[in-house]
Amino acid sequence: MGFLTILKKKQPDPAINDYFVKVSNAAQRIASMIQFTSEYEKIGVNAPVWQDCSTVVDTAVKQTPLEKVVVKNDLTHGTEVFADPLIVKVFYNLMDNAIRYGGKITTIRFSVEESGEDHIIVCEDDGVGVVAEEKVKIFTRGFGKNTGMGLFLTVEILSITGITIKETGEPGKGARFEIVVPNGAWRTTKKDT
């Protein structure tokens, strides 16, 4: 990408600008795919471990360029999931997608619900949401406006320990991702007060 920056500064002919933009976009896509490949090959390398959900979300927040978006982490300390150590990437991807595609998003909220013996970690935002026709497709490799790899990677990371994810939001009212953690893959530990 360094040579493209130099070329842009020295570019004498504005007529060539369209070609420059296409080459620059292609280079960015290639760089993103290389990064994805690097991350994908790490899935399952390390054994799953118990991880505090609230702490993992806090770590992901620090890695995410939030701009003016507020993240509300309502997950309580002491609720743990048994997952691949890359689970932090799951929460990063959800926030990154909300910021990229949510429109005029102001808030992302993480919470937990119970459904029978399962725990559901909810990530919801106040953006534009996901249209009904794309609720399943967004998890497919290559689908999307950027690299199409983030939510595919999310599914792969979660599936290591039988955790699933689905989008259940209402289009026009925000996205809502439900991470379904089956019985045996979550636990509550004693909290310090």
Q: Across the structure, where does each feature detected by a protein language model lie?
A:
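Conserved C-terminal segment of the DHp
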Residues: 1-14
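Conserved DHp (HisKA) dimerization/phosphotransfer helix of two-component histidine kinases, i.e.
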Residues: 17-68
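Conserved catalytic submotifs in the C-terminal HATPase_c
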Residues: 70-81
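Short helix-loop "hinge" at the ATP-lid/N-box region of the Bergerat-fold HATPase_c
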Residues: 98-99
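Acidic ATP/Mg2+-coordinating residue in the GHKL
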Residues: 125
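Short conserved segment of the HATPase_c
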Residues: 130-141
